[in-house]
Amino acid sequence: MTSVEPNVYDPQQVESAAQQYWDATRAFEVDEASDKPKYYCLSMLPYPSGALHMGHVRNYTIGDVISRYKRMTGHNVLQPMGWDAFGLPAENAAIKNKTAPAAWTYKNIDHMRTQLKSLGYAIDWSREFATCRPDYYVHEQRMFTRLMRKGLAYRRNAVVNWDPVDQTVLANEQVIDGRGWRSGALVEKREIPQWFLRITDYAQELLDGLDELDGWPESVKTMQRNWIGRSEGLEIQFDVRDVDGGVLDPLRVFTTRPDTVMGVTFVSIAAEHPLALHAAKNNPELAALLADLKQGGVSEAELETQEKRGMDTGLRAIHPVTGEQVPVWVANFVLMGYGTGAVMAVPGHDQRDNEVANKYGLPIVQVIALKDPRSEEERSWDATRWQDWYSDKSRAFELVNSAEFDGLDFQGAFEALAERFERKAQGQRRVNYRLRDWGVSRQRYWGCPIPVIYCAKCGAVPVPEEQLPVVLPEDVAFAGTGSPIKTDPEWRKTTCPECGGAAERETDTFDTFMESSWYYARYTSPGARDAVDKRGNYWLPVDQYIGGIEHAILHLMYFRFYHKLLRDARMVDSNEPARNLLCQGMVIAETYYRPNPDGSRDWINPADVDVQRDERGRITGATLIADGQPVVVGGTEKMSKSKNNGVDPQAMVGKYGADTVRLFSMFAAPPEQSLEWNEAGVDGMARFLRRLWAQVQKHAADGAAPALDVAVLDASQKALRRKTHETIGKVGDDYGRRHSFNTAIAAVMELMNALAKFDDGSDQGRAVRQEALQAIVLLLNPITPHASHTLWQVLGHGETLLEDQPFPQADAAALVRDALTLAVQVNGKLRGTIEVAADAPREQVEALALAEPNAAKFMEGLTVRKIIIVPGKIVNIVVA
């Protein structure tokens, strides 16, 4: 036995001993040379921000419980860990701390690795990597050059947020009220060249593949379906005339509502559209608007909520049915990067167009009337008062004011207009997707260099594979007003691999979603020359993936896309990266603050607050420990730096031990729901572990337990043994099928309570107690592995890896009851209970029920019509 003082539960001593044993035996390093079925359990890798938070602890504890359970059920389990190490926070921290992003990142990795190890996770650390290391990102550089050659990576202009003071591109979240988060300067929209991956080529496959992901939450699949956004419609051509009547390039618009085309009264185009730029050349007022619209962010959400603005360009579009001219407007809600950068405006039946038309006095025409109006309001149509039915194609309607198309419903109008436009070469049926190609360029330093060389003669040339990786210099002076590699001619200047002439490297770096889109595959093939080798097909797909639902769209979409790229590169055989997905809920905690005179709030950490509660545990007041004065209770919210309501996991581990923290994080809520951090609850888990420790020590102090002989057990011994095996069955189901760890713990607690009441020092009493305690130790092992490691030894076993012990199996014979308690009902109402032998004949059960004293009172003077017996549960006597 490792050196542990057995009589006192000292978490630090117990946990240190267990971790030393696991390290010495390399307990959780695995390979493919196993005859056991494989199981790959993966929690989303962390960003090395500096310290773990409770969200990390919950995420990785869930994964660890599943991993340890699966190993105990006979699986070859892989649970790896790495670091999503590139990204903007490192640049921000470098500015703040006057250091290089690399130094800050590696320091954080070292600290967080120590924190993770202190929690005792069953991780194969031999597979660890950081995505900022060249031996990792070389593989995505190689993949990118191959995608370039296949035409799946391409370069085009795209609009970005530009900070004119810091001379840098800003992410959408760095634009606050239209200004740069650091400089405060008004942000401009600027069009610059960007690299893209053709994820849209995989749109239909990504959509269809969701139907095969039975182990993914429906909510995630629904979000992905909506994000992919498959829609069937028509692409319609509008010819365009210049201010002087000259013919310009036609506009093409995609619409899912061609039935409303007769309601088009103008066409809207993006401020960056070539026709807008053309019209602005001789229109100073329009040019000023275009310049103004360059200010502010470029996110779709921002454009959706801002005030609608626009201006007539003077250009005219020719209506494809009537031949009438309609004005072409620039509008701030049309994005050049979405579709064609132009939309047909139907203000009678599109709310956004309706706002613009009413604001600027543009015509509004009704072309749809309901067949089934449900109210007087729905029988009328008012251009100035929007009603939802105006745009609801699910309602039964017919076309009006639509010439030869009057009276048609949606499908009839769709088919008639499609046939007309295709016959006249004015349009065609199209399947469109909301999904856009993945822009992977970032005008930042701390990221993977994009492996492209620019040559005046040869253009954009992929870096030859033998010259990879293109290594990012780490020892740089970083001020935050530009990328060090852009200003470093020694790094930037190179020779063209095709013609040998002078050339320059691409100074953009990859979006960090690139690194996190394929990391799961690299874990399977450490040291492989390519991204993945044959070991990938042994481990993949991931059997259980764990992470927050906030990643449902971006990460989990790119994760699935990159897997298909790996498949098409013949590196993996599977179509999807993960069979099952568990999205854990947030960790929330109380917030406390003091208001300031200017209306702002000083948020106070819960550790600095003394809380008063009533007998039901509800907060009745709170004071600041430092001065004893009241603070305001702000309610429970997600743990965050902004609300200063985070709880330091390291402090909790130091105070209570890792097993207690793990136990509380699994007990407080089901994995998918929010977990409210409550230190009183943590203290309760600590008391539970101390009780378990004391029970095992007390039992062991009486010496080795005799062998169990089930044939001679008395009723109380059978009852405890039955409870033990009922618990084994429930906990195994909760772990394996339901991932309901809180109810598994509750079941073990019930067994502990039964054990505490079991006062039997006989040989078979001690044998039954030994079986129960061994079961508890093994059942809790996935959650409290350190305590279980020592307690297993206290129960008379040698030091061993409990994950290699078989998970307990319920003995069906132990579940059989000698006697049953049945409820007695009279006309369906409970009137009493009876005790019967488990094998009692029906006649005996009926007689005992009829004789039950309280039930008999309700049958006086009445005739028994029927007796219904639900075996093992109820006897219902029907009287009249």
From Swiss-Prot:
Reaction it catalyzes: tRNA(Leu) + L-leucine + ATP = L-leucyl-tRNA(Leu) + AMP + diphosphate
Compartments in which it is found: Cytoplasm
The enzyme's E.C. designation: 6.1.1.4
UniProt motif ('KMSKS' region) ranges: 638-642
Listed GO biological process terms: leucyl-tRNA aminoacylation
Keywords on record: Aminoacyl-tRNA synthetase, ATP-binding, Cytoplasm, Ligase, Nucleotide-binding, Protein biosynthesis
MF annotations from Gene Ontology: aminoacyl-tRNA deacylase activity; ATP binding; leucine-tRNA ligase activity
Residue window of motif 'HIGH' region: 46-56
UniProt keyword annotation of Cytoplasm present: yes
GO (cellular component) term, any one: cytosol
Catalytic EC class: ligase
Main location: cytoplasm
Keyword Aminoacyl-tRNA synthetase: yes
Positions contributing to ATP binding: K641
Family that this chain belongs to: Belongs to the class-I aminoacyl-tRNA synthetase family.
HAMAP family: Leu_tRNA_synth_B
Protein name as it appears in the record: Leucine--tRNA ligase
